C-alpha cells in the first residue's frame, strides 16, 4: 500500500469541464481523424453510432458510457444518436493532461 502523504504533490489533480451538453444527432455528426486536447465522455441515451480508432470500429449504443482520451486520434459517426457529452481535462499539479497518451477508447 502506498502512503499518499509520502507524495503530496503527485496526488493533486483537477478535473475541469471544458464543454457539456445534450445532443440529438443525425448523419451530419461525422468526422474523420479527430484529435482534441481534452477527453470526451459520452453518455449514450438512445440510437446508435460508432467510434473508430486504428481501423477498429467500436459500436456505440444507448445505455452505455464511452471515454475518448485526450490526444487520441479517432473518427466518429451515426445515423441517429441521442447523447449527453462532457469534454473534460484531467490535469496534474504540473498541468500535465493525465489521460493524454492513452491509446484506447473505453
What is the meaning of each model-derived region?
Residues 1-59, 64, 72, 78-80, ...:
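Generic protein-terminus/edge-of-domain signal
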Residues 87-89, 103-106:
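Short, intrinsically disordered, charge-balanced linker/junction segments flanking boundaries
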Residues 99:
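Catalytic core of bacterial cyclic-dinucleotide metallophosphodiesterases
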Amino acid at each position: 500500500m502506498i502512503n499518499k502523504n509520502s507524495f503530496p504533490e503527485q496526488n493533486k489533480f483537477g478535473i475541469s469541464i471544458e464543454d457539456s451538453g445534450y445532443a440529438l444527432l443525425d448523419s451530419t455528426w461525422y468526422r474523420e481523424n479527430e484529435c482534441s486536447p481534452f477527453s470526451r465522455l459520452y453518455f449514450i441515451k438512445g440510437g446508435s453510432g460508432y467510434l473508430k480508432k486504428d481501423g477498429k470500429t467500436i459500436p456505440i449504443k444507448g445505455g452505455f458510457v464511452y471515454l475518448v482520451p485526450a490526444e487520441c486520434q479517432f473518427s466518429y459517426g451515426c445515423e441517429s444518436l441521442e447523447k449527453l457529452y462532457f469534454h473534460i481535462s484531467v490535469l496534474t499539479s504540473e498541468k500535465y493532461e493525465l489521460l493524454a497518451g492513452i491509446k484506447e477508447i473505453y
